[in-house]
Amino acid sequence: MKIHLLSGFLGSGKTTAIQNACGELTKKGNKAGVITNDQGIRLVDGDLFEHLNIPNRQVMNGCFCCNYNDLDNSIQSLIETNKPDVIFAESVGSCTDIVATVIKPLLKFRPETQVTFSTFADVRLLKMLLQKKSSFDESVRYIYFKQLEEAEIVVISKIDLIDANSLEEMKQLIDKRYSDKIRLYQNSFDTANIRQWLTVLDNQPVTNPSSLPIDYEIYGEGEAKLAWHDQQLEIQSMSYNAAQATNGLIKTISQKIHFNEYPIGHLKFLLNGEKKISLTYTPQQELFDTIADKKNNSAGLLINARVQTSPETLSHIVSEAIKETEIKFNCKILVKSHASFQPGYPKPAYRITD
């Protein structure tokens, strides 16, 4: 069995790639399982994989490295229950030091398993960081570039969202900076690109990659700069405009964060357990996939927001957006669950160096 481990910063496109790769594998008669990972306890991506009937497990309340035993138990559970040919394991986007804390323990404790390692990077954010135009804190940037430094395979994602000239310039920079790595330029909605990535993974030889020196003080500081906000809402409307209100709430949250110039890791929303909307850190946001044309009197919305600010500030922004939406759309928004926090200091269960 193979485990395809994915790293990469928040909003880098890991989940989309996994979702479409699972679809391609299923067409070929292969069984795939997924393990998602987050610092919180309710994850948009986990709910989405459930809706798509893709066998999955979730490692919550911390990264793979700090919850390695939970990761191992999740692998075993998928093997016993679903017997997958391939497992995709997606590490939380604020995590690095994957080789020493996840890959080497996997190779030690599961020597029969083949492990590949891909790190994803949104081409637009990478361009901003290389040009020093991003407002992410230096400690957050440290995590970002360590993720790329330790990768075997670098997947430059979302290339469809950048113009051809800029992409060519980025290719020249990336090919020079990461010449020692396999480099893929990918639109994960493009079937040919997904098939190319899967081919690279299939042909990747078994290796024992080298661990990186990691300054855990900077690493911990970087994680602590990011606020996590998870919230489950129910939107109720006697005017049958719950969909419009939900769309308005999503836009208001995004606009308030951008107005305050807080760098966004990602904003993920899941409507009624099945429709996902993702927004990231770039000034030119992707177009909203509008949901405002549906007429219904209630809607469920799960929010996962990861933003460089304090948990209190992020929680206040969402609360104000809820109040404004209730007034504007004459609706009632009920909070079913809510958690705002900063990730704790990284304390890996294992750290195997060379």
Language-model segments: what does each one mean?
Residues K2-S7, S12-Y142:
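Nucleotide-state-sensitive switch-loop elements of NTP-binding domains
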Residues R141, F145-E223:
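Canonical P-loop GTPase G-domain recognition
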Residues M1-L6, G11-S12, T16-A17, N203-D354:
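P-loop NTP-binding site
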Residues C63-C66, F189-R195, F341-Y345:
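A short acidic, often aromatic-flanked loop/helix-cap motif at beta-alpha or helix-coil junctions
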